[in-house]
């Protein structure tokens, strides 16, 4: 299988670097100037400085390059995915498309695989998700991710193609569970960042992670997912990494909220839109997701951090 990565952000670049160490790979950039710059310097200095590109990694801004590839990794922000797929439908039709973003579409409430199937129905849709930072992957540090794909035979072939010496993939056919785990951990990371930013302590963070995980499971099971999926890399694993590191943009957004500081609006933070979309879905489905709703209220400035903590602590006592 021949692989191309669409999207020259930090994560897309890191995946392309890792794959190119194994076999020739193509990285597609939206901007010709950006592609020319990367080709010239052999480094994506704008998005992933300090990570030189292997010789086997080709860089282009020509979408026609997809004709030579069987597998396309889509490293495109969740809220821009539908527009991107619609604009390039002809080039993507009939391919194996692997979404590499984590989130819920604000307008539809759909995850990345559902959006793929909705916009390019004749493509094979898969999802690559789990605990990872771009720099770790680019540097060749040990990383394990979840590859969600149905049917499993296609998943096996993709698993073999996309695994590298340092990037180990575990597969599942539970696309719904993998989608929800990867999306909602960003919401919980915002909450955890907020309590650390407000100096409410690591005990509060642990409580939010644990009860946030319960919310992730609640929604996933209501959507027909398997509980073991959420206990794996795409759920618990990603939650653990994202809620404990300032390398996470979602956690850093939470820190800013907790400290009462402004956050750079140019930085993509998938958890903000996901919180709003999920709060709406939970209300429609009659699910209790108080942490998700609280994060939405914080983002929309309907609550202060102090009020949010007070509101969560004063909820009716219940059995765990």
Curated annotation (Swiss-Prot):
Residues that bind NADPH: 11, 30, 102, 134, 249, 270
InterPro entries: 6-PGluconate_DH-like_C_sf, 6PGD_dom2, G3P_DH_NAD-dep, G3P_DH_NAD-dep_C, G3P_DH_NAD-dep_N, NAD(P)-bd_dom_sf
PROSITE patterns named among the record's database cross-references: NAD_G3PDH (PS00957)
EC number: 1.1.1.94
Catalytic residues (UniProt): 185 (proton acceptor)
GO molecular function: glycerol-3-phosphate dehydrogenase [NAD(P)+] activity; NAD binding
Cleaved signal peptide residues: none
Primary location recorded for the protein, binned into one broad class: cytoplasm
Catalytic reactions on record: sn-glycerol 3-phosphate + NAD(+) = dihydroxyacetone phosphate + NADH + H(+); sn-glycerol 3-phosphate + NADP(+) = dihydroxyacetone phosphate + NADPH + H(+)
Location(s), subcellular: Cytoplasm
Record's keyword terms, sorted: Cytoplasm, Lipid biosynthesis, Lipid metabolism, NAD, NADP, Nucleotide-binding, Oxidoreductase, Phospholipid biosynthesis, Phospholipid metabolism
NCBIfam families: PRK00094.1-2, PRK00094.1-4
Family, as annotated: Belongs to the NAD-dependent glycerol-3-phosphate dehydrogenase family.
Protein name: Glycerol-3-phosphate dehydrogenase [NAD(P)+]
Species name: Ruegeria sp. (strain TM1040)
Source organism phylogeny: Bacteria, Pseudomonadati, Pseudomonadota, Alphaproteobacteria, Rhodobacterales
């Amino acid at each position: 299988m021949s692989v191309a990565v669409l999207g020259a952000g930090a994560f897309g670049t890191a995946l392309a670097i890792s794959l190119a160490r194994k076999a020739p790979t193509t990285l597609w950039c939206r901007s010709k100037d950006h592609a020319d710059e990367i080709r010239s310097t052999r480094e994506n200095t704008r998005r992933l400085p300090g990570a030189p590109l292997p010789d086997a990694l080709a860089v282009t801004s020509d979408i026609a390059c997809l004709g030579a590839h069987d597998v396309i990794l889509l490293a495109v922000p969740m809220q821009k995915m539908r527009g991107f797929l619609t604009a390039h439908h002809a080039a993507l039709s009939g391919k194996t498309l692997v979404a590499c973003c984590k989130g819920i579409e604000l307008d539809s409430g759909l995850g990345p695989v559902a959006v793929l199937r909705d916009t390019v129905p004749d493509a094979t849709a898969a999802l690559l998700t789990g605990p990872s930072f771009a720099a770790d992957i680019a540097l060749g540090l040990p990383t394990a991710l979840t590859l969600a794909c149905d049917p499993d035979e296609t998943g096996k072939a993709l698993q073999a193609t996309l695994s590298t010496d340092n990037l180990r993939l575990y597969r599942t056919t539970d696309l719904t569970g993998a989608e929800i785990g990867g999306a909602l951990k960003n919401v919980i990371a915002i909450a955890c960042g907020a309590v650390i930013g407000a100096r409410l302590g690591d005990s509060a963070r642990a409580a939010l992670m644990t009860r946030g995980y319960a919310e992730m499971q609640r929604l996933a099971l209501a959507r027909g997912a398997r509980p073991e999926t959420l206990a794996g890399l795409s759920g618990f694993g990603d939650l653990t990494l994202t809620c404990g590191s300032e390398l996470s943009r979602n956690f850093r957004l939470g820190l800013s909220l907790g400290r009462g500081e402004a956050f750079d609006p140019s930085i993509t933070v998938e958890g903000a839109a996901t919180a709003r979309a999920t709060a709406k879905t939970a209300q429609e489905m009659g699910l209790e997701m108080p942490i998700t709703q609280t994060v939405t209220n914080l983002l929309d400035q309907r609550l202060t951090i102090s009020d949010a903590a007070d509101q969560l602590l004063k909820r009716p006592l219940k059995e765990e």
